[in-house]
Amino acid sequence: AVFATGARWTTTGYSPYRPERSNIPGCHLPIVMDIKTAIEVVLASPDGLGKNVIILDETGEYLPLGLAELLADSKIAVEIISPRSFIGADTQRTLDMPYVMPRLKNLNVRLSPLHFIEEIYEDSISVYDIWGGEPTYRTDVSAVIMAMTQNPNDALYSEVKEHVLAYKLGDMIAPRRIEAIIYEAEKLGRDI
């Protein structure tokens, strides 16, 4: 049996940019949500996340940008915060950047690269510049969306691996880019 059950987004805020802490203080508050859940909420109700949404992105990929665009199209205030040098870095590799970024700017999405969330409160957050200085605050925050780490969905594999010849594939081993998973799947298929 080959298991490719994927991974689920986390909301802890754990980051290799802040290895000294296991989470962002306040990550368990009701305003915090993972990006997959946030997209489901917005697709069901465009204003389901409230009127002022913060997206903390460590992926550099399209998903947080797409969510920001959906929200901003519905007149929701959106800010994308990332510790990376620029927002949506992976869209440069996929050649999406010259199309996506102008749309986000035209929709007044605030982009804050080289920043990170220090703490989450009931309706606000403190943000710091990774190069130093005093934290700044964002108030009247209705939702904080985490697009950061993922945990493998390996429960089913763990249950049956003692009873059948079982192989793991894809994000359930370690979340990563689709190209690596395609390569791994072909290699596994050939090996079997």
Q: What is each model feature region?
A:
Residues 1-11, 27-28, 40-42, 49-51, ...:
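A Rossmann-like FAD-binding core segment of flavoenzymes
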Residues 20-21, 96-99, 184-187:
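Short, hinge-like loop/turn segments at secondary-structure boundaries
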Residues 65, 93-94, 157, 178-182:
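Conserved strand-to-helix beginnings and helix N-cap segments that scaffold or border functional pockets
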Residues 180-192:
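An active-site-proximal "capping" alpha-helix that borders the catalytic cofactor pocket
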